């Protein structure tokens, strides 16, 4: 009961951020129906990214239709990703939510990258720019058990360019947190991006 532990530690939870694999078999409607019967999904606002399990049915058919239709998120993503990729403001922070499943080839990644550039630049240039920018996706920045670079290689030049403050990911089931990095090197923290990936709720694969 991870949420129960968090509530006992600090009951002032504003909302919940989920980094993908919300459901075991998200391509099957019954899993979303059962999810929203859970107490915490009634009581807390939450935002999440589409993970690979959120696409898979029990027959291994792939669809994110239920992720899109069962969750009420801003429809401000790019073509083909409305209701799956999205961005929002909370206080002085901007959150940009990505879908790795649509970035498996170069064309898919480039579409996502151009959208991130567009929405972050527009926000930075607005009359009320965010103080912090978070970018969230499911797949890990680094392979936690080896430290080998994963999605970091794809995204770090763009994050450096845009001044993204924090990059959040999941999937690897191992807690990883970098120093603040820019151009592949740790900085004094005044510039660069902090990369964090979260474990599963039971931390089944350890920490690094």
Give the positions of each predicted feature:
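Short acidic, glycine-rich surface-loop motifs adjacent to enzyme active sites
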Residues: 19, 23, 123-145
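Residue-level marker for buried hydrophobic side chains located in beta-strands
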Residues: 16-18, 48-49, 135, 168
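Extended active-site neighborhood of metal-dependent phosphoesterases/phosphodiesterases
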Residues: 29-129, 154, 160, 166, ...
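Acidic-and-aromatic substrate-binding clefts and catalytic sites of carbohydrate-active enzymes
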Residues: 23-29, 104-107, 142-149
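Active-site glycine-centered loops adjacent to acidic/histidine catalytic or metal-binding residues
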Residues: 20-21, 51-52, 138, 170-171
């Amino acid at each position: 009961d991870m949420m129960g532990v968090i509530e006992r530690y600090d009951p002032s939870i504003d909302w919940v951020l989920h980094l993908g694999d919300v459901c075991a078999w998200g391509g099957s409607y019954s899993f979303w129906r059962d999810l929203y019967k859970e107490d915490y999904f009634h009581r807390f606002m939450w935002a999440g990214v589409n993970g690979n399990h959120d696409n898979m049915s029990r027959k291994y058919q792939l669809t994110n239709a239920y992720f899109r239709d069962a969750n009420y998120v801003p429809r401000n993503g790019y073509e083909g990703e409305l209701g799956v990729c999205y961005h929002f403001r909370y206080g002085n922070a901007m959150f940009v939510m990505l879908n790795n499943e649509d970035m498996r080839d170069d064309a898919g990644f480039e579409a996502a990258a151009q959208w991130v550039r567009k929405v972050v630049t527009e926000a930075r240039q607005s009359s009320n720019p965010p103080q912090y920018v978070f970018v969230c996706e499911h797949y890990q920045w680094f392979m936690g058990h080896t430290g080998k670079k994963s999605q970091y290689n794809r995204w770090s030049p763009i994050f450096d360019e845009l001044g993204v403050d924090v990059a959040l990911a999941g999937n690897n089931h191992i807690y990883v947190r970098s120093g603040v990095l820019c151009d592949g090197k740790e900085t004094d923290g005044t510039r660069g991006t902090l990369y964090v990936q979260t474990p599963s709720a039971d931390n089944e694969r350890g920490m690094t």
